[in-house]
């Protein structure tokens, strides 16, 4: 029933907060031959920030409370506590939730039962840690906070430095201000509708905070608030969408969100200039696949000629941009 919820000209902001990542995108509702179509017009970075961060934040908060009571936890118990906090979080953020829930941290060794540590986590603690810590009110001009990094770091995934998802949302909409045909001088992309996805957003309080922050930004611009679209089961929507996409691709019919490549992709081309001491030749970026390039299409670069370096080690440089 999605056609009953949207209209031609709508810009839908999709906020997807899952277990380990946050993804943001903008989808335009278009009309073609009398039928409504969906086209993805902007995609944000794949932010490594999600429900796992929230579970760890709760676990470390409870661990500090236990340490103050003379009950320090080891690394194994902290991981077990994070799993217990995940279950408690989902219950305490739901409608009609109790004021607190018990949390049991198992011990290791022969005293598995008798040595277990019992505590509780309150609804107020969850609200303070998650809603205020990960979804704080902010201005649309705020950018994710960064800090000076240590010169040496362990190799691993590029986790987000700022845990505030609302600031990542503000940065995404600000970057995409020029991607939409909206009023000239708009400081950020202004969606007309909002769609949630991901198990984290099943919590009504988190959902309400995002709606409140986004519509606060829109009110400052003097535009109507974004309306919340009704979705299905938020933790199963991606799996169902993937299955439906396979169905559409196999049978060649059905509703498909047009969008193509999520980024523009470039290859580096070294400039042909005279040698200058201490200066490397400038690198130009040649676009190989523009944003939105559909699967199976080709782009001919007939007007370009390049020299290929052979017989020696070389380095191919590739770049991507979501702006």
Regions found by a protein language model. Name each.
Residues 1-323:
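Oxyanion-binding/catalytic loops of NTP- or PPi-dependent enzymes
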